[in-house]
Amino acid sequence: MEKSWFNKTSQEVEQELKTDCQNGLSSNQVQENMKKYGLNELQEKKKDSLLKKFLEQFKDFSIIVLIIAAIVSGVVGVAQGEGFTDTIIILIVVILNAVIGVAQESKAEKSLEALKKLSSHASKVIRNGKEQVIPARELVPGDLVIIETGDYIAADLRIIEAVNLKSQEASLTGESVPVEKITEKIDGNEIGIGDRKNMLFSSSLITYGRGKAIVVNTGMNTEVGKIAGMLDNAEKQETPLQQKLNDLGKTLGIACLAICAVIFVIGLLQGKEIIDMFMTAVSLAVAVIPEGLVAVSTIVLAIGVQKMVKKHAIVKKLPAVETLGSSTVICSDKTGTLTQNKMTVEKVFCDDELQDVKKVNTTEDFKKLVYNCMLCNDSRLLEDGQLAGDPTETALVDMAFKLDYEQSIYRENPRVEEVPFDSERKLMTTVNKKNGKYIVYTKGGVDELLKCCNSFLYKGEVRTSINNYAKWIRENNEKMAKDALRVLAFAYKELDHMPSKAEMKTIESDLTFIGMVGMIDPPRIEAKKAVEKCKKAGIKTVMITGDHKVTAVAIAKKLGILKDESEALTGTELEKMTDEELTKNVRKYSVYARVSPEHKVRIVKAWQENGEVVAMTGDGVNDSPALKTADIGCAMGKVGTEVAKEAADVILTDDNFATIVSAVEEGRRIYDNILKVIQFLLSCNVGEVIVLLLATLFAPQIGQWFGISDITMIQVLLPIHILWINLVTDTFPALALAFDPANKDIMDRKPVKRNEGIFTKGRTFRIIYQGLMIGLLTLSAYLIGLGTTHTAIDGLTLEQTKIEVGQTMAFIVLAFSELIHVFNIRDNKNSIFKTGILGNGVLILAILASALLMVVILFIPQLRTIFSIPILPSDNIIETIVLVLSPIVIVEIMKLFKVNTTRDE
């Protein structure tokens, strides 16, 4: 069972770890403990090799189908003496897809490495009775550590000496305010990390004071280490797009086998040769499977990734882009994600009224308050203009600077004496000299300070009998506390002489109360708009934080995340719920406060059990397991811990919650465009299948109508024609669809459900009827070619000439009608005359490039030979143009009568 150190006295810890609270460990003890516990390091998960990453790309069912098609094509090619041309083309596509996937993962890893800090931390310890500085990785349990302001804590420590010690633990607990530390033991066993005030934890920062502590846990045994261990056990689900494309691949694979089997049997019944029917079946297989779909989908995602970089998001894995677009719930950490992670003064009580700091009246009383904020303060201004020190104190100085108070105030009012803050008095006092006078400035908790005051400032006057006025002060204190503001009170008195040491002992008496300030880690300005945008888009925002409930609720109300406090739940309340109860009730809650890393994972899983696609944002170590469990984890790049970045799928380089919403919008655009690609490629492929099916089924009749005695010659398209169209002619326009801009209403519609497949009622209807349209147009071209050819070409019989002219017309009409058809795909509702054809310049270039490649094949003799294409007779050109332009006319008529879409679209 794991040891608890917070409920032991300093002496018990000292005895159990065999250390010395004065002299620390001996050299021999250090060596023994190093052997026993190892280095103070987190175990890094071994990164996959390039080969493993490459092989991972071949798991998709659609890729497996393509590989099988390549093998079959190779076998048939050898049997027919045509070589491996088809096989090589298919394998190039498969390998290209894998290379793109690996390249993106490697690129994201490099970007992540660039974000990592290169600094290595050191710790000051006492060993053998002497102080020494050692690398933090060499700390062992039992080490006696000296702690000072600004120190980074590199192991879990039990405090044995503390002088005004405060620690910033936001990255671990989510609490935005530094925690005051104590040395006394804490009774109880079930004490949350945030309430173990006699402990210091790895990854936290000392913001104030000094002390000594004993190392109790290192490496993977620290609280941070336990979280890192949870990451290895976190399950990662397939993204919605991966699931849908895999389902699509299986559907196409089954359809391919079924169609091939039917055609093979029909052909044999018609008396055709087995090898001929095998070739026809291969042609059908090639026609059914959209060879370019996987590569195009990958490239569409890669293009989306590049756009995301410009929007301050680094995507580690390609499918993550689309998952963002499918998100239905965003679970967000509060501190540093929804808030600025910077304490800021919001309210001021001065001149007898509670005022917004931005609208405060700059009276003489307020001036005294600001001087107190600046001078009774231990924060310091760095050379780069940044403030360093306790966040509460830096907030006070920041307020003064924003109100144009100058640094010269420090020079004109030098500090000559002080009484430091301590947790018992909850007060801090300085004595500052100005123009021969001595002014005592005191700040602290409201109740503690009022005990030291016998008068108060009231609109420029000093008034006595503070007791009645104290009620009004406390009422305003409560108002600020209800808004989750941290309140500090300020008082002063003037002396005509430098106080003696004896006088300093009672200096905090007979003070004049000036006023109070209320501060909070405020919401990001852009976060409220982002939350509103999420609501419009049908996405629920959930706040999950380690901070106190009152603070979380106040921030959530300001952001519009919750309306009523009943929507908030604490970690203690959550602990009492079973997983089943949480799954059943998870929709009731919008805010979770004082939760642990384990709780965050449970919340994410509960939403997933309800069929939601969950995005999780955060920056702390405490967010990491949930980041990995979520469908999409988004870590903050600037202040995010390395553990969080490793666990995430996306890293937001500007630490901005609004960026996640922009990323969702980009994800939706990409998903829409992938659906356009699928509809385009499948409708084209269905057209090819219909042509081959009809030609095979009605081969005897076609032979009879057009005087072709050998019906085995009747083949509308050769395998090389289909491959060329699928891999070259169609691929460029399909790729260009990736650049289609988002629809204006893209963030005004509900997210796509996780279980909604690609083949919705409307999309299935469009794929079938548009495929039928392309198939019949292509077959018509073939039949026209057969029927209008009356003269044999040199070296060919008339029958052979008819077949080649028919195939040429079919090839041209199929290729060019599909290029025209891509304009229909861009918008299923609105007419092309409304949307225009120039909205996507890349698409225009892609169509021109594909058309140019077709022209090259048609007019270069060597290529015509490879593709078995004769020169097209001039008297067939008019019919060809009419057939090529027909898809636009047909689909426009369907749109006009509103039958291109279903009611639910």
Segments (PLM) and residue ranges:
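Conserved cytosolic headpiece of P-type ATPases
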Residues: 1-751, 756-759, 772, 811, ...
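Pore-domain transmembrane helices of cation channels
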Residues: 775-776
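A C-terminal functional module that forms or caps the active site or interfaces directly
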Residues: 825
